Regions:
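Cleavable N-terminal signal peptides
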Residues: 10, 21-24
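Bacterial N-terminal signal peptides
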Residues: 6-16
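Sequence signature of WD/YWTD-type beta-propeller architectures
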Residues: 24-521, 527, 546-554, 558-562, ...
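Aromatic- and Gly/Pro-enriched helix-to-coil junctions and flexible linker segments
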Residues: 23-41, 45-47, 77, 437, ...
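Intrinsically disordered, low-complexity regions enriched in polar/acidic and amide residues
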Residues: 15-21, 109
Length: 782
């Protein structure tokens, strides 16, 4: 072990917190990590050849924008292609190059080798104005064919987006039954942050070997990437999400069955750092140990960063200290994540860029990647060795040097051994060219009756299991919510406002599908909508939140799924089951029903499904019961609850939000209260941390003993149904708009001569439930 690594480990073991500097002030960059002189031999690795991709780095500006801006025109070269390197002869051969494909100089992204090692499937873009499509070729170069083609409604999709663009199919992978799983923008989702709708959010799809029978497997609101098949037949993949979390956390790793059923987290939901866990690969013979690249949200050149090991069954579900923090220990069994290359890491709060270890022991924050080495695309060849794409020169720019990345073999001791590089282009996705055992083909059983109605069944054996501080029998109801994706057809009618739903809180609107009862033993058995991003809230007898599921699950039509409690993290031990079945299973499954405030006899519309829209749900209650004291002139206690439209929202809403009277705000983007800290908030929160249990507003409206009620008792001001409506809104993380549809900026309160078709009656209009959950905009939105 060289002096560099010994010094690094010494710092780690004593828990030294290295000083962080900016690149301009840094000492000379770190030397090459320890390099073993012994050549890499086929006998050692167990295979003779490596298949890989040659091209320039992506030109992406974010980790999820490869399909948007990752392939600038200078990236399209005839010699881009798939190649095989022979470890015995030291020679390489081309399998296929862009010169022999349509356009003659396209861009190849990611490859996947068939289980028998005879075929390669890959994504290819012919030119900057064409979409990525899935192709296949024999490892001998024969049988080149295009597998996926533009959808029949490609032109209509682009028109809905309102941009001269296209769909993309990327990251293909063979399934055990011969089908191909891939990520695609055919779903017509866009990311939720940013000032425009031009950044797409692909999700997982699958298709038959001939490219037919394309099926969308997920309705995730934001991006899913890089599927890979585990030894047990499940699919592992990357998933970005933020359900009441900051937009820069929760870049997670999940699994699902090949048909999209039973999605389950491997790691990331409680990780409160900015690290993006991309390109996961299972460790040999072990599906709960994963190697991946830990990269940054931005900038990007194809997801480059540090090599990370994750053991989903070991240690704390949150990340441990960074290498520059007190208490850091290399290979610390207290935590699930280990950085194999700690001379580079993604700091938990500083973006953009990477942190590199310099010669003097300081860590350098560098946005250009020119202060150290970068890695990506790890492929495990044993339980301690990995083929990687490696930026050899520490001073090379992370994406502007064409041949910066080569194939190296690294190990858990920090050793680096050269394998292969090209004089002109970088080498990516190194994969052993050898056959693998075909995993079992999982064929989940679905209930045909529920599938026909686009429903699934959920069983909760004891919702109170794992809920600290919740008494037995305290949970009476579950509220079924959907996190809505933002479809291309929504446009950006709220522009220039950043958020479509709330003021620096949720960037997405939620709708309620109804509530279902919880039995005395904590069990529940009920229907849920299929192919929706569903999450639950545990409610008390007054339909107020006790705990919130800050993630979502997609249930496939006819799927039957169970969980053992509202524990907030996967991997918990299932409590022992007694001889008697849960009470909920002794009856028919519950159908989601309206809350009492939504019943027709109580003034509601009688529907279980509800759009939660502050201007029409909450403001009328304030107008009727509150503004006489909390009006525009000398409002009581300095709280003004009038409903005048502000630039994006309203007076009362902004008063409640600024003062956090509806409980703590969980900002999903830069917070007006906390600045950049609003991008995080990913850590697990125990019950009663959000919503009604922490709301001053609800306390004043329900507790006669509250100090605010000493002179003027507000606790009986609202009738039960009004209080229930306000309580439901409080449990939404300050949602203002109930859907993406409609004109939101105050400019649209009046007619606009430039848009004569616009009717001011549609200003901040409340969508119907069916409109809110729909893929296509209602006529009044356009």
């Amino acid at each position: 072990m060289c002096g560099f690594l010994k010094a690094l480990l010494a710092l780690a073991i004593v828990g030294h917190a290295a000083q962080v500097t900016q690149a301009a002030d840094a000492a000379p960059t770190s030397p090459l990590p320890p390099t073993a002189s012994a050549p890499v031999s086929p006998e050692e690795l167990g295979f003779d050849e490596i298949v890989f991709v040659k091209r320039k780095p992506y030109s992406s500006d974010h980790y999820y924008t490869d399909v948007n801006n990752g392939t600038s025109p200078d990236r399209f070269l005839p010699e881009n292609g798939i190649y095989v390197y022979n470890l015995r002869t030291g020679r390489e051969r081309a399998v296929v190059t862009a010169a022999g494909m349509p356009g003659g100089k396209g861009f190849l992204g990611k490859i996947s080798l068939s289980f028998d090692a005879r075929q390669v499937v890959f994504d290819f873009r012919e030119s900057p104005d064409r979409g990525f499509r899935v192709w296949e070729v024999g490892i001998d170069g024969a049988g080149l064919r295009q597998v996926s083609f533009p959808p029949d409604d490609e032109a209509r999709k682009a028109a809905r987006w309102g941009r001269p663009w296209h769909t993309d199919d990327v990251h293909p992978c063979y399934l055990p039954d011969g089908r191909i799983i891939f990520s695609s923008t055919r779903c017509e989702h866009t990311v939720l942050c940013g000032g425009s709708a031009h950044l797409v959010a692909p999700v997982l799809h699958c298709m038959a070997p001939d490219g037919t029978q394309i099926e969308q497997l997920s309705k995730s609101p934001v991006s899913e990437f890089c599927p890979v098949v585990l030894d047990d037949g499940r699919v592992m993949y990357h998933r970005w999400e933020y359900i009441d979390k900051g937009a820069r956390v929760a870049k997670t790793i999940w699994t699902m069955n090949p048909d999209g059923s039973r999605p389950q987290e491997i790691y990331g939901l409680a990780d409160d750092t900015t690290t993006v866990y991309m390109y996961p690969q299972p460790m040999p013979g072990n599906d709960h140990r994963v190697v991946c690249v830990g990269t940054c949200h931005y900038p990007q050149g194809g997801c480059v960063g540090a090599i990370m090991l994750i053991d989903a069954k070991t240690g704390n579900r949150a990340r441990g200290p960074d290498p520059d923090e007190e208490g850091y220990v290399a290979f610390d069994g207290r935590y699930a994540v280990t950085n194999v290359t700690p001379h580079v890491f993604i700091e938990r709060r500083t973006e953009p860029g990477w942190h590199f270890l310099a010669d003097d022991g300081r860590y350098v924050h560098d946005r250009n990647g020119q202060s150290g080495h970068l890695y990506t695309h790890p492929y495990p060849v044993s339980d301690r060795e990995f083929l990687v794409s490696y930026k050899v020169s520490p001073t090379d720019h992370y994406k502007d040097v064409a041949n910066a990345y080569a194939i190296w073999l690294i190990d858990t001791d920090g050793n680096h051994r050269f394998v292969h590089r090209d004089a002109r282009l970088s080498c990516w996705h190194p994969t052993p060219l050898r056959a693998r055992r075909v995993p079992p083909s999982i064929q989940p059983v679905r209930d045909a009756e529920y599938a026909a109605r686009d429903r699934a069944l959920c069983v909760v054996t004891n919702v109170e299991h794992g809920m600290q501080g919740i008494e037995r029998g305290e949970v009476k109801w579950l509220r079924i919510n959907e996190a809505l994706p933002r479809y291309w057809d929504t446009g950006r009618r709220w522009e220039p406002s950043l958020s479509s739903s709330a003021w620096k809180a949720a960037l997405w609107p939620r709708v309620q599908w109804g509530v279902v009862p919880v039995e005395e033993d904590g069990s529940a058995y009920f229907e849920v909508p299929a192919d929706r991003s569903v999450f639950f809230q545990a409610l008390d007898e007054n339909f107020r939140e006790l705990q919130r599921e800050r993630t979502y699950v997609n249930y496939r039509p006819g799927e039957v799924r169970s969980c053992n409690g509202c524990h907030g993290e996967s991997g918990h031990v299932v409590p022992p089951v007694g001889s008697e079945a849960p009470l909920a299973l002794r009856r028919a499954p519950s159908i989601p029903q309206p809350q009492p405030c939504d019943l027709a006899e109580n003034g509601g519309d009688g529907r279980a499904g509800q759009v939660i829209h502050y201007p029409t749900d909450v403001q009328p209650i304030f107008d009727a019961k509150c503004v006489s004291c909390h009006g525009a002139t000398d409002p009581a206690d300095g709280l003004r609850l009038t409903g005048e439209p502000t630039l994006y929202y309203s007076t009362s809403y902004e008063e409640l939000a600024r003062k956090q009277l509806a409980g703590p705000i969980i900002p999903e983007f830069t917070s007006f209260l906390w600045g950049d800290r609003g991008n995080y908030n990913g850590a697990y929160l125990p019950p009663k941390s959000l919503g009604c249990p922490t709301s001053v507003l609800i306390a004043v409206l329900t507790d006669p003993a509250h100090p605010k009620n000493a002179e003027d008792d507000h606790s009986a001001m609202l009738d039960p149904w009004e209080l229930m409506i306000v309580s439901r809104w409080v449990d939404t993380n300050y949602q203002f708009y109930g859907s993406y549809y409609g004109r939101h900026h105050w400019h649209w309160v009046n007619p606009d001569p430039k848009v004569p078709a616009y009717d001011p009656a549609d200003f901040r209009r409340k969508a119907t439930f069916d409109e809110a959950v729909g893929m296509f905009a209602p006529p009044w939105h356009r």
